[in-house]
A protein has these predicted regions:
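Extended boundary segments
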Residues: 149-193
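Short, well-ordered loop/turn sites that connect or cap secondary structure elements
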Residues: 177, 218-221, 227
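Glycine- and charge-enriched low-complexity intrinsically disordered segments
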Residues: 226-231, 251-296
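Short, structured beta-strand/loop micro-motifs enriched in basic residues and often containing a Trp
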Residues: 202-215
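Structural register within alpha-helical repeat arrays
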Residues: 21-22, 54-58, 88-91, 123-128
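Generic helix N-cap/helix-start motif at coil->alpha-helix transitions
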Residues: 11-20, 44-53, 78-87, 114-122, ...
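Hydrophobic/aromatic side-chain positions at a characteristic register within alpha-helices
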Residues: 27, 60, 94-95, 129
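Alpha-helical repeat scaffolds
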Residues: 1-10, 31-44, 65-77, 99-112, ...
Length: 296
């Protein structure tokens, strides 16, 4: 691509699709001197979406994080609804070791509509948000999970495990869901279920409508209580915060749908087996030289 474009490159290039591709190719090929020359010759203030991304990445390569912040802010002024550029702004702020309260201020300005629905750029943004406001990241992930439990299971568990050591008290902000406030763990006919109580949802294996007979019954029960539901007896085991329920269900789904190429394992430990039983399971899996996720 580089050799094809160079013979027809004007002395004063302007932003265009072909220049976007050329600049990206120079960056990918690590031809930074040529890239710098191109960007210098194009110093006319008319940058495309893709060219701004190249400039930001070039600033990161040079460890010029202040410049990366400036360019990211410029990009957001043009493309304020871009998850990609909000992620770039957070990335640059973290790289520059900006004070936490200033980063949290940036996070507070992210338009909520751009993370209302799942997108891959939105997911990348969410992982960066989690570094300064884990509660916000978790609340968004839970909403995405409600929309698509199976499709979001891996992403939700990854977010959880990536932030196990993160201090959830970095902010005092609370982001309650408008449609889900709790989750139930209950047994029925010898099987244990974990379900989110979600307003106006179609009840499924993972979600339960509070206006359904079972939803109303569980809402009125105390932990440990048993009640008749049709021909069956149900027992309420736990009432969980919604986000905890979403993580637990995600763990179960990810384990169930694992086709064998996901280095993820869910260990079920019987109380009677104790620590010895747990160690035997860990030893069996560790011999396969794969990553283990210990879930309790």
């Amino acid at each position: 691509m580089v050799k094809l474009v160079e013979p027809i490159l004007p002395l004063a290039p302007w932003a265009s699709p072909i220049i976007d591709i050329y600049a990206e190719s120079l960056l990918a090929c690590d031809q930074l001197e040529k890239l710098d020359e191109l960007l210098l010759n194009m110093n006319n203030g008319k940058d495309s979406f893709r060219l701004l991304a190249v400039k930001i990445e070039r600033a990161h390569i040079s460890n010029d994080y202040k410049r990366a912040i400036e360019l990211s802010e410029l990009a957001i002024s043009k493309y304020g609804l871009s998850c990609f550029y909000w992620a770039q702004l957070l990335r640059a702020n973290y790289s520059e070791n900006i004070e936490l309260n200033k980063i949290q201020n940036v996070v507070s300005k992210i338009p909520k509509e751009i993370i209302k629905s799942f997108s891959f750029n939105g997911l990348n943004l969410l992982h960066l948000v989690a570094k300064s406001d884990l509660s916000l990241a978790e609340s968004v992930a839970m909403e995405w999970f409600i929309d698509d439990p199976v499709g979001m299971a891996t992403n939700v568990t990854n977010l959880h495990f990536n932030n196990l050591k993160r201090n959830n008290d970095l902010t005092k902000n609370v982001y309650p869901s408008e449609r889900c406030s709790t989750a139930f763990v209950y047994t029925k006919r010898g099987r244990t279920y974990t379900k989110l109580l979600v307003d106006d949802c179609n009840s499924s294996e993972y979600l339960l409508n509070p206006d359904s007979p079972l939803g109303e019954l569980l809402s009125d029960m105390d932990i440990g209580e048993e009640a008749k539901e049709g021909m069956s007896t149900i027992k309420l085991i736990e009432k969980l915060p919604a986000i905890v329920g979403a993580f637990r269900i995600s763990i179960n789904i990810r384990d169930d749908i694992n086709p064998g190429d996901d280095c993820f394992y869910s260990l079920s430990i019987n109380e009677e087996d104790g620590v010895e039983g747990m160690l035997k399971q860990i030893d069996s899996i560790s011999q396969q030289k794969q990553t283990i996720s210990l879930l309790f």
